[in-house]
Amino acid sequence: MSVATQPTIWLADPIPSTCKAWLSERSTLVDGPSSDVEAVVVRTATQVDRALLELMPQLRCVGRAGVGVDHIDLKACTERGLVVVNTPEANTESVVEYAIALLLDAVRPRADIPNDSSHELWESSRRQLTGGRRLAEYRIGILGFGRIGQRLGKVLQVLGAEIAFHDLKDESHFPRGFSSRSLEDLFAWSDIVSVHVDGRSENRGLVTGELLESLGPSGLLLNTSRGWVINTRDLQHWLAHHPQARAILDVHEEEPVPMADPLRNFSNARLLPHLASRTESAVEAMGWVVRDVMAVLTGSEPNHRVC
């Protein structure tokens, strides 16, 4: 492809250098929206709304380096006849590994021996860090049973845990061997609930105080999906009134978490900086959405088409 015929692409958000170099050999990269742009590549920071789309009249493709597309106006894209592509399988294993690690942190606490540790510290550490139950003795509910939820369920089953799930889709859409429950029943049945729902607007505030109360005074809530899925005020009330309850939150309604966020003051809330998908290999795999972008621009069918 000659320079004269290369498509113009805007990298709205940064992608790995290997992916950018590959794309730069096949296209002309620009720093912002313009009338010449035929494709835009985004991660999570850039909101692709109607106003932005109007700045790019020649646009043909939106590439999402990642999975969720709730920050992309799919209706507007469809009306314009734009193709939206993403990388739905790029970070599944990274998120599942991270969720398992956080669950093990919660049920099997551990610590290193300090270099200057005494006999008394050794004994007190053994007493304080003794886990209550093995992971296999917990009932674990998975809220949202897509790629990540299903993979997590399979891994937890191998470890011996009893698994149930809730999803908007009918049970017939999912593999056998997992129990489907209503949203209310899932929280009432579970010792631990791990949240893996998508970014559709209907999921905002999905986890209410009533559901948290049914999870119980010693329940554990893990969220690696979207921060706004949980009603924050209800979560604070639940944690304040149930000291044995715990929340592990990798995602937050506002990121970075504000210094004034009340959840910072809860000893039974663990706040993490949105790390679930952050392995170098997963980030690079997400960056390779540029291959599907080029497929669209050269008239081929992409591997992962959203609309």
Regions found by a protein language model. Give the residues of each.
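Phosphate-binding beta-alpha-beta segment of Rossmann-like dinucleotide-binding domains, i.e.
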Residues: 88-139, 151
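Phosphate-coordination loops involved in phosphoryl transfer and adenosine-cofactor binding
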Residues: 6, 59, 136-139, 218
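C-terminal helix-to-coil terminal segments
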Residues: 3, 78, 85-98, 112, ...
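An N-terminal-biased, well-structured beta-alpha scaffold segment characteristic
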Residues: 1-85, 188, 208
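A short helix->loop->beta-strand "cap" motif at the edges of active sites that frequently abuts
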Residues: 56-61, 80-82, 161, 217-219, ...
